């Protein structure tokens, strides 16, 4: 208990989107480390459908801000799979929590990875004595392919319903990447913007960022 309380470890835990693997962020991590005197370690975990986990990489004892990427064998789309992935991620997080004894972390989710993080934070985060400091979602379709808030997906309705379970000290950034001002061709901008109905007023702060151009 004392060791966890005094821990300096603050991992950045990333979840890729549908059809992506635990290798999704390799390029970004390499670029991040290229101009840093102090390199971030990279631990990659693949959660198999049978519950087993494959670990690759390591976290050094002196690394206070390692990057952990969690991918899934079941990386398909759809609300039922998002819930399955959140449940499997919880099992993975429990192992990380016991093994590394951290008391806080930062969260990044790309596309459906942001949905998995949101589902986890609403349903499982209270199980851990951890401060979830920041959540950044990148192009996460909170209303799936719907173009309008007039038609809410079941997932969005549930996320809004259970948003009171979100950590109240969480800082959230929602990034919408668009080639035009309407849609990036894959995720409707309105679907990303729907995140505000989940987070505003429920977390410490919520900021939506729209990136346009190349």
Feature locations, PLM:
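Lipid deacylating catalytic domains
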Residues: 1-108, 112-214
């Amino acid at each position: 208990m004392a060791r966890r309380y005094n821990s300096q470890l603050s991992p950045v835990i990333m979840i890729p989107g549908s059809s992506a693997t635990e290798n999704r962020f390799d390029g970004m991590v390499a670029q991040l480390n290229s101009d840093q005197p102090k390199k971030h370690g990279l631990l990659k975990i693949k959660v198999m459908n049978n519950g087993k986990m494959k670990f690759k990489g390591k976290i050094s004892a002196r690394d206070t801000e390692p990057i952990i990427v969690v991918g899934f064998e079941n990386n398909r789309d759809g609300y039922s799979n998002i819930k399955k992935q959140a449940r499997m991620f919880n099992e993975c997080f429990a192992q990380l929590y016991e093994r590394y004894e951290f008391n806080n972390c930062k969260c990044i989710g790309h596309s459906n990875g942001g949905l998995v993080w949101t589902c986890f934070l609403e349903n499982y985060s209270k199980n851990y004595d951890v401060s979830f400091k920041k959540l950044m979602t990148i192009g996460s379709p909170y209303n799936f392919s719907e173009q309008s808030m007039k038609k809410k997906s079941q997932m969005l309705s549930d996320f809004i319903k259970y948003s009171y379970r979100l950590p109240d000290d969480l800082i959230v950034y929602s990034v919408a990447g668009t080639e035009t001002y309407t849609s990036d061709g894959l995720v409707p901008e309105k679907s990303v913007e729907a995140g505000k109905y989940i987070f505003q007023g429920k977390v410490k702060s919520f900021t939506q960022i729209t990136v346009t151009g190349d």
